[in-house]
């Protein structure tokens, strides 16, 4: 993980008290807005000015939701389902989540890192065990948990076909969702199909390819917008959100709508 990404993680923790304070103020001032919380990794996380043009899909999701559905993006660079728990980040979400809210959980990129015991989980055992803690925590507070399979990386074989990169993790999540009776957003399958349709060259315009970096994991604004659109469509398809709660599913969303705030000191 680069220095920039470590700084982003620190900034996210620093912002937590402000986020909780703002939530408390909003609740005291009037009717409670329904909130969709995101627990995830760098592919979904808020990015700051020093990381631009890298963009998490969570930054683009509000463009596809009506204003009465707020987005609280708690995703943080470099986290797995395990390390997010161990650092107390789920506890922060559970301190503010409530009835009618949604907890969207998407992990696997860093769960796959077998060389790092602080992050690694095994798909059919510890990965599922960790995910259950998110499901149980949301349910205990009257919120709705939702699982999203991990968005695919940009990887093609010699024949130009997009290939999956997440091993058994998507299958393990699908099985858990079925066993637990929770909605599943199959972003892994949908993003793989999207990269296949776009092809080797055009997908470069969706990922964080710059003059100095060829990043096949993280997105630029068009890529984040495309993935957020997939997420919003799945939220509608699975009836997690109602038709009145989504918008622009088939409309162009300009990349210029993405902005990067300065990182918190």
Question: Model regions: which residues?
Answer:
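N-terminal export signals
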Residues: 2, 7-28
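Short histidine/acidic/glycine/proline-rich micro-motifs that form metal-
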Residues: 44-45, 78-80, 152-153
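Structural motif
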Residues: 80-88
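Alpha-helical cap/lid subdomain in secreted, periplasmic
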Residues: 89-221, 225, 229-248, 259-263
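Short, basic, glycine/proline-bearing loop/turn elements
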Residues: 74-78, 119-120
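Secreted/periplasmic serine-hydrolase-like ester/acetyl group-modifying domain
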Residues: 250-253
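Serine-esterase "nucleophile elbow" of acetyl-processing enzymes
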Residues: 20, 27-75, 90-99
């Amino acid at each position: 993980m680069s220095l920039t990404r470590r700084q982003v993680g620190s900034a996210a923790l620093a912002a937590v008290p402000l986020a909780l304070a703002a939530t408390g103020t909003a609740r005291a001032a009037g009717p409670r807005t329904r909130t969709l919380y995101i627990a995830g990794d760098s592919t979904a996380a808020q990015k700051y000015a020093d990381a631009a043009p890298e963009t998490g899909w969570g930054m683009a999701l509000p463009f596809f939701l009506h204003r009465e559905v707020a987005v609280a993006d708690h995703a943080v660079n470099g986290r797995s389902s395990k390390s997010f728990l161990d650092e107390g980040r789920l506890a922060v979400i559970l301190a503010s989540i409530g009835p009618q809210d949604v907890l969207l959980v998407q992990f696997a990129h860093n769960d796959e890192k077998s060389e790092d015991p602080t992050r690694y989980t095994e798909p059919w055992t510890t990965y599922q065990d960790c995910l259950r803690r998110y499901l149980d925590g949301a349910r205990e507070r009257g919120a709705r948990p939702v699982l999203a399979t991990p968005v695919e990386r940009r990887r093609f074989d010699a024949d130009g076909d997009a290939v999956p990169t997440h091993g058994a993790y998507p299958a393990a999540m699908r099985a858990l969702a079925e066993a637990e009776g929770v909605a599943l957003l199959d972003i892994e399958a949908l993003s793989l199909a999207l990269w296949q349709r776009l092809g080797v060259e055009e997908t470069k315009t969706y990922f964080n390819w710059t003059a100095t970096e060829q990043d096949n994991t993280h997105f630029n604004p068009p890529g984040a917008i495309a993935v957020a659109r997939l997420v919003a469509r799945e939220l509608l398809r699975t009836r997690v959100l109602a038709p009145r709660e989504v918008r622009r599913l088939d409309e162009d969303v300009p990349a210029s709508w993405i902005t990067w705030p300065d990182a918190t000191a």
